């Protein structure tokens, strides 16, 4: 059986960048665990704020965190109170100076993480898995996606035997490295156990820009 590599990991260094950007020698393991703690804390604290991606950069004793969210108002809070409280909590957690940037996601229906989380929440609210997937596909295509594929796995509809069902529309060229494909997973906790949700969204091609050389401007 052909297995599918993670489309995001496959494109790192080509059209995607790392979510953590820092270099360390001795303290690598400690900083990696710190990154995991930061991500876990932010996702838990902002679980209703539609957070898609958390980027972490480090320089000396400073941590720069960029939070990509579809609900920036909820993250920032009234007069910046929420983001300031989050910054203080992360400073206490890491023991370093923390700076937080908030980036708004303009089209949440084209973000695989948010689409997967949305399908998972609907499944927890006992919405039919077929209906949840088809609605997500329609919204993504209306938002301008070139293609989308969704898959839900587990005891669908409370069946005794677990299975997977997937739906797709448009094209999702997983082998084309210049194709901007967003991929994410989510879990739904239902009365029959966990259901796994996977989403692939093709947002069009990204052509790598050629760097001009100083000689002749080629």
From Swiss-Prot:
GO annotations under biological process? translation
Looking at the record, the residues that make up the KH type-2 domain are 38-106
Q: Name one Pfam family in it.
A: KH_2
Q: Which GO terms describe its molecular function?
A: mRNA binding; rRNA binding; structural constituent of ribosome
What InterPro entries does the entry give?
KH_dom, KH_dom-like_a/b, KH_dom_type_2, KH_sf_prok-type, Ribosomal_S3_C_sf, Ribosomal_uS3_bac-typ, Ribosomal_uS3_C, Ribosomal_uS3_CS
Specify the domain of life of the species encoding this protein. Answer: Bacteria
What's in the keyword line of the UniProt record? Ribonucleoprotein, Ribosomal protein, RNA-binding, rRNA-binding
Q: Which GO terms describe its cellular component?
A: cytosolic small ribosomal subunit
Entry's HAMAP family? Ribosomal_uS3_B
Name the family the entry cites.
Belongs to the universal ribosomal protein uS3 family.
Instruction: Please describe the quaternary structure of this protein.
Output: Part of the 30S ribosomal subunit. Forms a tight complex with proteins S10 and S14.
Q: What does this protein's UniProt record list under function?
A: Binds the lower part of the 30S subunit head. Binds mRNA in the 70S ribosome, positioning it for translation.
Q: What is this protein called?
A: Small ribosomal subunit protein uS3
Source species: Geobacillus sp. (strain WCH70)
């Amino acid at each position: 059986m052909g297995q599918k590599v993670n489309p995001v990991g496959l494109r790192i260094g080509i059209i995607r960048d790392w979510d953590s950007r820092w270099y360390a020698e001795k303290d690598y393991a400690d900083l990696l665990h710190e990154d995991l703690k930061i991500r876990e804390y932010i996702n838990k604290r902002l679980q209703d704020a539609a957070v898609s991606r958390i980027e972490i950069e480090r320089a000396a004793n400073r941590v720069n965190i960029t939070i990509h969210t579809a609900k920036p108002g909820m993250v920032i809070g009234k007069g910046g109170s929420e983001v300031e409280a989050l910054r203080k909590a992360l400073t206490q957690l890491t023991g370093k100076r923390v700076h937080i940037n908030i980036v708004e996601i303009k089209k949440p229906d084209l973000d695989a993480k948010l689409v997967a989380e949305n399908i998972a929440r609907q499944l927890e609210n006992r919405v039919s898995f077929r209906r949840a997937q088809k609605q997500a596909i329609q919204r993504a295509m209306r938002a301008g996606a070139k293609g989308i594929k969704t898959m839900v796995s587990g005891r669908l509809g409370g069946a005794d035997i677990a299975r997977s069902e997937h739906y797709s529309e448009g094209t999702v060229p997983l082998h084309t490295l210049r194709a901007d494909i967003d991929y994410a997973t989510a879990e739904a906790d239902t009365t029959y156990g966990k259901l796994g949700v996977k989403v692939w969204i093709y947002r069009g091609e990204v052509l790598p820009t050629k760097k001009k050389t100083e000689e002749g401007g080629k």
